[in-house]
Amino acid sequence: MGFSLLVLLTASAPFSASAQSLQSVEAFTEPQNSQSERAKGASGLPLPRFVSIKSDAANVRRGPGPDFPLLWQYQRRNLPLEVIAEYDDWRRVRDHQGEEGWMKASLLSGARAVIVRRSAHAVTLRAVPDATGGVVALVQPGVIGTLEACKGDWCEVEVDRYDGWLPRDQIWGVYHFEFSE
């Protein structure tokens, strides 16, 4: 007699982000390049690129420096962000909701994470990269996972000690051209 265990993974901590839209800091904003011609930032790393938050709390400012007004504070370790510009040791970042601001580079990590996109339902974490693969867990929108690899339309993710595959279009934090076969 066999049985199946179905695990529902939910977001454990809210992230704080202002609902207000940011005014652009045009003096410091670089144009976003097409994915095929990714520019290099001041750090020598490609722009844009994905990173994650290193600590439990990370301030976001209106401009690249401590004298710029504080806009909000993220309170969610490993939240994926997209670096879209650099100025000295500051990074202009965009989150999965489209909010932008500047963060000190030391608050960010190159470790890759993804967040399940907002939708009306949980996403199935599969044992193999196929819609017919065995169910490992159901993952709620807003849950963060560690990105391990992608294969076609699927990405291998570790979520709360569960390993499996999520559809690439159901997560934010990876470009369509990354991990190409």
Predicted regions mapped to residue ranges:
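N-terminal intrinsically disordered, compositionally biased regulatory/targeting segments
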Residues: 2, 18-19
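Bacterial N-terminal signal peptides
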Residues: 1-13
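SH3-family beta-barrel domains
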Residues: 19-62, 73-77, 84-87, 94-99, ...
